[in-house]
């Protein structure tokens, strides 16, 4: 029957495990766990890289031209990957000074790095430990062989010892040989994602921002304080239902956020009505 070769193969494998002893089962168990871990990690990395970085950047730039940061946030909310999360964080607080934006992006980066590298240490350990377990099985098999070479030499016992030594060695090496290319592939994909993130962190240094704010009372001192601040390009008073000051500035050049400047220099608080970031 056509099933005979398959049945014979599995029968041979079971016989190998029975003959190899506990070490064989242990190597097989960690090998299966490592293989499953590798497949899960590959699936995760393929999922987060499904959308290209240029596609995300294009969507952000187009959205910012239409409706500013809020529109861009809505647009990239559909992309759940490290690049989109870094950009989202920069958009959320992009009107603040550069150090605050960088700190926020760094926090997201740390979280995403943890997600990407989770399980890698275990996988690497399995690759290193499996051959060592095989070596232990080899030593045990040799011990069986020498014990059989006693006063009454037993050829069957000698053969069993050699068999144990060979099986455990082969299985340990096989686990390492199978998992090592998967590990290399995973680390390569992670490095690619890190390169993308580093590029995005540099690209999110927005050229300038326009903010509409509402300040209670006289705004002359607010206008003066803002104009004297580094990074502020222009300030103008407007008569709008929800805002009375519009300020344009370069986020990367601000020492403090716009709101903090107003609080510290004027003793007033400002309500941010709208902020738009521009490349």
Swiss-Prot record:
Gene Ontology biological process: protein import
Source organism superkingdom: Archaea
Pfam families for this protein: MotA_ExbB
Major place of residence: membrane
Membrane topology, record value: Multi-pass membrane protein
Keyword terms of this UniProt record: Cell membrane, Membrane, Protein transport, Transmembrane, Transmembrane helix, Transport
Example of a GO cellular component annotation carried by this entry: plasma membrane
InterPro entries the record matches: ExbB/TolQ_transport, MotA_ExbB_proton_chnl
Location in or out of the cell: Cell membrane
Residues spanning the membrane: 19-39, 126-146, 162-182
Keyword Isomerase (UniProt): no
Coiled-coil intervals, chain numbering: none
Similarity section: Belongs to the ExbB/TolQ family.
PANTHER family (UniProt xref): BIOPOLYMER TRANSPORT PROTEIN EXBB, PROTEIN TOLQ
Protein name: Putative biopolymer transport protein ExbB homolog
Organism whose genome encodes this protein: Methanothermobacter thermautotrophicus (strain ATCC 29096 / DSM 1053 / JCM 10044 / NBRC 100330 / Delta H)
Taxonomic lineage of the native organism: Archaea, Methanobacteriati, Methanobacteriota, Methanomada group, Methanobacteria
């Amino acid at each position: 029957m056509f099933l005979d070769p398959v049945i014979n193969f599995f029968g041979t494998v079971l016989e190998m495990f029975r003959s190899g002893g506990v070490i064989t089962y242990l190597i097989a168990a960690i090998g299966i766990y490592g293989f499953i871990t590798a497949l899960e990690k590959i699936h995760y990395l393929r999922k987060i890289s499904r959308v290209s970085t240029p596609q995300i950047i294009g969507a952000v730039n187009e959205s910012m031209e239409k409706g500013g940061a809020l529109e861009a946030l809505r647009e990239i909310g559909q992309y759940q990957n490290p690049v989109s999360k870094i950009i989202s964080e920069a958009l959320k607080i992009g009107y603040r000074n550069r150090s605050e934006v960088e700190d926020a992006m760094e926090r997201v980066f740390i979280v995403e790095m943890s997600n990407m590298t989770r399980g890698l240490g275990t996988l690497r350990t399995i690759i290193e430990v499996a051959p060592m377990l095989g070596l232990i099985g080899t030593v045990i098999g040799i011990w069986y062989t020498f014990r059989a070479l006693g006063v009454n030499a037993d050829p069957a016992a000698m053969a069993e010892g050699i068999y144990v030594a060979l099986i455990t060695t082969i299985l340990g090496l096989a686990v390492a040989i199978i998992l090592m290319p998967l590990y290399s592939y995973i680390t390569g994909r992670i490095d690619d994602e890190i390169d993308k993130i580093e590029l995005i962190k540099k690209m999110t240094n927005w050229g300038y921002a326009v903010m509409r704010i509402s300040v209670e009372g006289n705004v002359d001192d607010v206008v003066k304080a803002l104009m004297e601040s580094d990074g502020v390009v222009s300030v103008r008073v407007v008569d709008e239902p929800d805002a009375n000051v519009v300020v344009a500035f370069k986020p990367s050049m601000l020492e403090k956020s716009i709101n903090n400047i107003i609080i510290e220099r004027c003793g007033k608080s400002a309500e941010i009505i709208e902020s738009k970031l521009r490349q």
